[in-house]
């Protein structure tokens, strides 16, 4: 009888291991390699109809997709800083205050109270490492080595074009005092271990110079150092097979200005700088994957590749391609739906394709689940916290559908979403960029993001069926027999539930904000009256500045 009970227990254990992905990783915990590119267009890569067909072959990313899962409804945020903040924290950007692009000299950054992928995985005893683009602020408390990463090497704090502002070869007409200011406030490559004061490796400029010994490296060579840092970490990690690791590699390409490394110039079929840079990005991903396999780390490592936001078509032709309406900086699909590939041999089915609603927000809950830790109930300063992240491990391992049914789209400092996806329907309230123009069934000019007009619908949203019309061409809210006015019930309910969370979990102070539109004298005086009245009750409000 005892032997039968033992056998039954063993069989039950085996069954649980087979059906529950979380149990399967109890020992050993999986390693995680997260590769994030910059501004890659949905249609740039081979698995999405790009690659060789667009004059920019991507054999390494093609191979990654062939061996893993490709996502077709994966969402980021519409610009760099919010996209990276959402990915790191598992929270919509307005909760952390990281709502818009961070510029040099602003200081501040990701609040220390926020949890990141790294700080949560540290609770599961992971070794954590960061290299490449951070773009989440300049203050010491906001840097990777203060946000859960054991070490950061060649952390870069800005978008690529920020490194050209003080370069006289780029802008010879700039006032010398302004150039001096940019030189002073623009930080270069930063490195340091947790608990240490970061040190600057070298400054960055927009030239074809690779002279770290002289204290300067140009834009074309940055990703070489990011790749080298990633490979160095993997080689060291292989010496400690019982220590699970999380490495976050963030390539600077293909944000404009695209300046391919010399060995990749004219290596694409189309010979353009953007295409050459895609070829370079693909090659560097391939080098990391080759090293992973060479070291035998591929057997227990989840690799996840994605990008921070949609294609920035405002800067065409130095820009990615998206088949969707809109561009970076808008609530349209073109600004938010991005490429994403997950790979883990023996765990993720080769050649899998998924169209569930998932996104960068979901990496937090997913990685925590794989590591066997719960998401915290309080932030790092002891205050209650909420996450907007869903565990998509059932999707990855083929055991179930994605739990997410909605996606909220935000641009800049929106508190209520500018658009909402519920199931396969999408409501658009913020018409930023294209002014909500009717298309007549034709493609919309998407070369207007931040440069386009800012406008909200008066009363009712535009509604699109993303299954039938992923390009958002046909508004079906009130159109004869196709009208879908009834969808407002679902959209309103989703927004109501979101807005309730702000009451219990108030958003943090904005960490980066640029010009947000004109302030009229009447509005200024009205605000001043309210401010003066509140001051009598001891409540202080800053005066608006237009920023």
Language-model features and meaning:
Residues 2, 9-15, 23-457, 461, ...:
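Formylglycine-dependent sulfatase
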């Amino acid at each position: 009888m005892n032997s039968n009970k033992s056998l039954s227990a063993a069989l039950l254990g085996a069954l649980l291991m087979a059906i529950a992905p979380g149990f399967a990783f109890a020992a050993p915990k999986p390693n995680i390699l997260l590769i994030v590119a910059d501004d890659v267009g949905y249609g740039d890569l081979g698995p999405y109809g790009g690659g060789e067909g667009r004059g920019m072959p991507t054999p390494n990313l093609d191979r990654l997709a062939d061996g893993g899962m490709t996502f077709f409804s994966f969402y980021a945020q519409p610009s760099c800083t919010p996209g990276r903040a959402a990915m790191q924290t598992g929270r919509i950007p307005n909760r952390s205050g990281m709502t818009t692009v961070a510029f040099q000299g602003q200081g501040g950054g990701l609040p220390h109270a926020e949890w990141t992928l790294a700080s949560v995985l540290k609770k599961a005893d992971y070794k954590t490492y960061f290299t490449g683009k951070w773009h989440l602020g300049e203050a010491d408390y906001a840097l990777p080595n203060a946000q859960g990463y054991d070490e950061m090497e060649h952390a870069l704090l800005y978008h690529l074009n920020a490194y050209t502002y003080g370069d006289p070869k780029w802008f010879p007409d700039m006032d010398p005092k302004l150039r001096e200011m940019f030189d002073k406030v623009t930080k270069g490559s930063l490195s340091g271990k947790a608990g240490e004061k970061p040190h600057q490796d070298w400054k960055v400029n927009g030239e074809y110079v690779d002279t770290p010994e002289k204290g300067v490296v140009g834009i074309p060579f940055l990703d070489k150092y990011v790749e080298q840092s990633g490979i160095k970490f993997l080689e060291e990690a292989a010496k400690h097979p019982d220590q699970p690791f999380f490495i976050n590699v963030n390539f600077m390409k293909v944000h404009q200005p695209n300046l391919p490394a010399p060995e990749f110039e004219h290596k694409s079929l189309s010979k353009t700088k953007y295409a050459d840079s895609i070829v370079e990005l693909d090659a560097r991903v391939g080098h990391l994957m080759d090293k992973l396999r060479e070291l035998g780390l591929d057997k227990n490592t989840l690799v996840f590749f994605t990008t921070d936001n949609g294609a920035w078509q405002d800067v065409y032709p130095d820009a990615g391609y998206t088949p969707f309406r809109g561009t970076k900086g808008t609530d349209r699909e073109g600004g938010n739906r991005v490429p994403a590939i997950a790979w883990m041999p023996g765990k993720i089915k080769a050649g899998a394709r998924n169209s569930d609603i998932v996104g960068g927000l979901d990496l937090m809950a997913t990685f925590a689940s794989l590591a066997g830790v719960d998401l915290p109930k309080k932030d790092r300063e002891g205050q209650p916290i909420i996450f907007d992240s869903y565990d998509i491990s059932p999707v990855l391992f083929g055991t179930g559908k994605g739990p997410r049914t909605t996606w909220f789209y935000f641009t800049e400092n929106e508190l209520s979403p500018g658009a909402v996806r519920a199931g396969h329907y999408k409501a658009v309230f913020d018409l930023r960029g294209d002014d909500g123009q009717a298309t007549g069934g034709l493609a919309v000019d998407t070369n207007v993001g931040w440069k386009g007009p800012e406008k909200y619908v008066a009363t009712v949203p535009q509604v699109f069926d993303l299954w039938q019309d992923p390009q958002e061409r046909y508004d079906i809210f009130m159109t004869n027999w196709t009208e879908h006015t009834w969808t407002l019930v679902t959209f309103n309910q989703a927004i109501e539930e979101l807005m309730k969370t702000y009451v219990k979990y108030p958003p943090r102070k904005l960490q980066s904000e640029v010009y947000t539109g004109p302030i009229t004298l009447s509005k200024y005086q009205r605000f001043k009256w309210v401010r003066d009245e509140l001051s009598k009750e001891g409540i202080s409000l800053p005066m608006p500045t237009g920023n």
